[in-house]
A protein has these predicted regions:
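Solvent-exposed loop/turn segments at secondary-structure junctions
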Residues: 118-121, 145-151, 173-177, 209-214, ...
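Catalytic-core regions of hydrolytic enzymes
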Residues: 145-165, 176-197
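Active-site segments of SGNH/GDSL-like serine hydrolases
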Residues: 170-174, 189-222
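Catalytic His-Asp segment of secreted/periplasmic serine-dependent ester chemistry enzymes
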Residues: 46-57, 177, 210-275
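Short, solvent-exposed loop/turn segments at secondary-structure boundaries
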Residues: 123-126, 179-183, 215-216
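Serine-esterase "nucleophile elbow" of acetyl-processing enzymes
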Residues: 90-167
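Helix C-cap/helix->beta junction micro-motif
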Residues: 136, 199-200, 227-228
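N-terminal secretory targeting modules
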Residues: 1-113, 122, 134, 250, ...
Length: 275
């Protein structure tokens, strides 16, 4: 993926979008071009960040924006401005709460199971799980397979035992890029989590960088992570690995440099539960 695409997929465009939109809100009505241009740029940047939410929430947000921009005479400017500002700060507050790396809680472990696709299985070089195994001095059971999606991950989860107490999921990218319908992805992910989230097991999952047509993927991930008490690593961390210098061999699969960065990220994220 290009740096520009990864910037939007990481969700980082939300924050300059908020700034532009608020500048438009504060611009005097006697400057209609500035007000309109700043507002539209802000809206595009915010929507392009793909905050995971149901489509009806996007509809309400855009509707409030249009009410503010093309305010009917019976609606006061103060009321329209207040409605839009509240909507903007609601989105901002929700996403800021999802921005930080979660503090992963659970019993300390010396082993880790990984269920993933080619990003974790590795292609043409050392995989990040292999690098992590040596750098952290832990035992890793890497069940990942190239081309795997959430349906394939069910078979991987079946290979786990009661002694596997720490699981990392890096799955869903092939579903997203392969055009799997969002509802099918959600059903597959729920089936996987029902299988994987056993009592006494800590489960961590990478949030997927998103594109506008697949926002429902992110919404399903967050909803199911809450339901099954899964720790979700925010998408910006994964996107930062991919957009680093020389991080990928083909724009998507990790190079040796990218694999080392991914291993360092996972080691940092799991540090509270790895020994």
């Amino acid at each position: 993926m290009s740096p520009a695409a990864l910037y939007f997929a990481s969700g980082e465009s939300l924050y300059p979008g908020v700034v532009f939109l608020l500048l438009g809100v504060m611009a005097p009505e006697r400057w209609p071009v500035l007000r309109s241009l700043s507002g539209w740029i802000g809206l595009i940047l915010m929507v392009g960040a793909c905050p995971p939410a149901p489509w009806w929430a996007y509809g309400i947000f855009v509707g409030i924006f249009l009410l503010w921009l093309f305010r009917p005479k019976k609606l006061s400017r103060a009321a329209a401005t207040m409605m839009l500002a509240m909507a903007v700060f609601l989105v901002l507050g929700t996403e800021l709460s999802q921005r930080k790396m979660p503090v992963i809680a659970g019993g300390t472990e010396h082993s880790l199971v990984i269920i993933g696709d080619s990003l974790s299985s590795g292609i043409g070089g050392p995989s990040w799980p292999t690098i992590l195994e040596h750098s952290a001095g832990i035992s890793i059971k890497n069940l990942s397979r190239p081309g795997a999606g959430v349906r394939d991950a069910l078979a991987m989860a079946a290979q786990m035992t009661r002694e596997d107490h720490l699981l990392l999921l890096e799955i869903g990218g092939n579903d997203l890029l392969g055009g799997v319908p969002s509802a099918d992805f959600a059903n597959g992910l729920e089936g996987l989590l029902m299988k994987a989230c056993a009592p006494g097991r800590t489960v961590v999952m990478f949030e997927l960088p998103l594109i506008p047509s697949k926002i429902a993927y992110g919404y399903s991930q967050r909803r199911l992570a809450r339901k099954y008490h899964v720790f979700l690593i925010p998408k910006r961390f994964f996107a930062d690995v991919l957009r680093g210098p020389h991080a990928t061999s083909d724009g998507l699969h990790l190079s040796k440099v990218g694999a080392s960065r991914m291993a360092a990220l996972v080691e940092q994220a799991l540090s509270p539960v790895l020994q």
